[in-house]
UniProtKB/Swiss-Prot annotation:
Catalyzes the attachment of tryptophan to tRNA(Trp). The keyword Amino-acid biosynthesis does not apply. L-tryptophan binds at residue 135. GO terms for molecular function: ATP binding; tryptophan-tRNA ligase activity. Homodimer. The lineage of its organism: Bacteria, Bacillati, Cyanobacteriota, Cyanophyceae, Nostocales. GO terms for cellular component: cytoplasm. The gene is trpS. Pfam families: tRNA-synt_1b (PF00579). InterPro entries: aa-tRNA-synth_I_CS, aa-tRNA-synth_Ic, Rossmann-like_a/b/a_fold, Trp-tRNA-ligase, Trp-tRNA-ligase_bac-type, Trp-tRNA_synthetase. This is Tryptophan--tRNA ligase. A motif ('HIGH' region) lies at residues 12-20. NCBIfam families: trpS. It comes from Nostoc sp. (strain PCC 7120 / SAG 25.82 / UTEX 2576). Belongs to the class-I aminoacyl-tRNA synthetase family.
Length: 335
């Protein structure tokens, strides 16, 4: 029996930050030898909200380079660009046609983002979860690493699979039911300016996040200015001190220390002691990623070859799934 397959991806919108790394990519790296992995740069998702066409291609390559710099190993994993595999868009259309509108209108992320965009909200944002379902189902993924905020989208994917197989493939299901792969620690890294909100690329304040490619002086400045409280003695899990819990968690994850060690080390500290310690830890943790990124981006031909190989491998799997779906729907084969 072969390895189970994992599918995940990140949008090429803005810089990758500690939330992306600790909540997703580092987890991929740690488990990649256990699975057959398909890691995608989801650039089709990137245009569901206003984007900059002048930087989309460069941002896409930057994310792929960061995958490699963070430790994604091509011996175990396949890296490709979503828009380079046309089956994503085609399967998304077929799934859109069988997905009830009210399922999509109930998605929490759509409701939140639609409020921000008002009358300018696009249909792409509404059907975003169906495209995500297509991404997963094309590769017959067994496991999908998701944060708590994406669990609802994965549940929708499972509902779509069940609906499709029931209507069109009862005797021989053509798409697999994916399961979530959830990491509790680090799954939700919070903002440096508000410990109750998730660290996000879309936050207008650069001070809210530490980007993977931030130079040391920027990291130091962001930590120096991050939101804290006047209480001496730093503790985990106090609901009245969300920023304290977040900063201790970040320090724990970046230092590699156990929670008990950090709790004992920091229980009598003030912020004046902790912030320099956290700053040094963050800078040292990101230095090898930044050095590897510079090495990879210096050789564009290498990165292009990685994405070319990735596309070819992805197409082999995706096109077979797409052919099975089209046959189940009754489409004629190309002549």
């Amino acid at each position: 029996m072969g390895k189970q397959r994992v599918l995940s991806g990140v949008q090429p919108t803005g810089n990758l930050h500690l939330g992306n790394y600790l909540g997703a990519i580092r987890n991929w790296v740690e488990i990649q030898d256990q699975y057959d992995n398909f890691f995608c740069v989801v650039d089709l998702h990137a245009i569901t909200v206003p984007h900059n066409p002048a930087t989309l291609a460069a941002d896409t390559y930057a994310i792929a380079a960061l995958y490699l710099a963070c430790g994604i190993d091509l011996k175990y994993s396949n890296i490709f660009v979503q828009s380079h595999v046309s089956a994503h868009s085609e399967l998304a259309w077929f799934l859109n046609c069988i997905t009830p509108l009210n399922w999509l209108q109930d998605m929490i992320q759509f409701k939140e983002k639609a409020v921000k965009q008002g009358e300018n909200v696009g249909a792409g944002l509404l059907i975003y979860p169906v495209l995500m379902a297509a991404d997963i189902l094309l590769y017959q993924a067994d496991k999908v690493p998701v944060g708590e905020d994406q669990k609802q989208h994965l549940e929708l994917t499972r509902d779509i699979v069940n609906r499709f197989n029931h209507q069109f493939a009862k005797d021989k299901p053509v798409m697999k039911l994916p399961e979530p792969l959830i990491r509790k620690e680090g799954a939700r890294v919070m903002s440096l300016t508000d410990g109750t909100r998730k660290m996000s690329k879309s936050d207008p304040s650069e001070l809210s996040r530490i980007n993977l490619l931030d130079p040391p002086d920027q990291i130091a400045n962001k930590i120096k200015r991050c939101k804290t409280d006047p209480v001496k003695g730093l503790t985990f899990d106090d609901p009245e001190r969300p920023e304290c819990n977040n900063l201790l968690t970040l320090y724990m994850l970046l230092s590699g220390k156990k929670k008990e060690e950090v709790a004992a080390e920091c229980q009598d500290m003030g912020w004046g002691q902790f912030k320099p310690l956290f700053t040094e830890t963050a800078i040292n943790a990101l230095k090898p990623i930044q050095e590897k990124y510079q090495e990879i981006t210096a050789d564009k031909g290498y990165l292009e070859s990685v994405l070319r190989d990735g596309r070819e491998k992805a197409e082999t799997v995706a096109n077979q799934t797409l052919a099975d779906v089209k046959a189940a729907l009754g489409y004629s084969a190309p002549v």
